[in-house]
Amino acid sequence: MKFEITTLDGGEAGSVEVNEAIFGLEPRADLLQRCVRWQLAKRQAGTHKVKTRSEISRTTKKMYKQKGTGNARHGAASAPQFRGGARAFGPVVRSHAHDLPKKVRALALRHALSAKARAASLVVVDDVRLEDGKTKALKDRFGALGWSNALIIGGAEVDENFGRAARNLPSIDVLPVQGINVYDILRRDKLVLTRAAVDALEARFK
């Protein structure tokens, strides 16, 4: 499987042969859904909280005597059925994270890469280095390349000037290759990999 390599100026820089076991799979939506759900659940704050009967500021005195009034039997007015009472089975602070096997996560990443390749939404670029960190100049380059909504994966480290110029652009994400993940790949229209990122991914899944 071969991809043409482009440059930030829109020129050609040869081609690269990639492993079909990484970029040529038949995408499985179930794997992608499981991985995205795992990522979003892990980042969910889980800080929602309501007060239980033991926490609200209300007297615990019995409302009226047990017998003789003709009314239903009640204890304290902090019970959930009364106005101002506690919430029954309300949310408490907890972690929403759940486990997903490492092999499934790795397979989902390969399927996400394959999905972009199959949709012709994967671009390999020679390098992402800039002499200055000017956002306007980079925006013009992206406009010429058609990268209005893209995830750009650099090498082990992202060029400082490139990262500074790209961070002010909406719908453009820049990550080092170690940070590549299924959710960020799928939420952008285009995936841009540097030559160094392709080599790192090939080595990772060897």
Curated annotation (Swiss-Prot):
Keywords: Ribonucleoprotein, Ribosomal protein, RNA-binding, rRNA-binding. The keyword Ribonucleoprotein applies. InterPro entries: Ribosomal_uL4, Ribosomal_uL4-like, Ribosomal_uL4_dom_sf. Residues 49-79 are annotated as: Disordered. It holds the Pfam family Ribosomal_L4. GO terms for cellular component: ribonucleoprotein complex; ribosome. One of its GO terms (biological process) is translation. One of its GO terms (molecular function) is rRNA binding. One of the primary rRNA binding proteins, this protein initially binds near the 5'-end of the 23S rRNA. It is important during the early stages of 50S assembly. It makes multiple contacts with different domains of the 23S rRNA in the assembled 50S subunit and ribosome. Forms part of the polypeptide exit tunnel. Part of the 50S ribosomal subunit. Belongs to the universal ribosomal protein uL4 family. This is Large ribosomal subunit protein uL4.
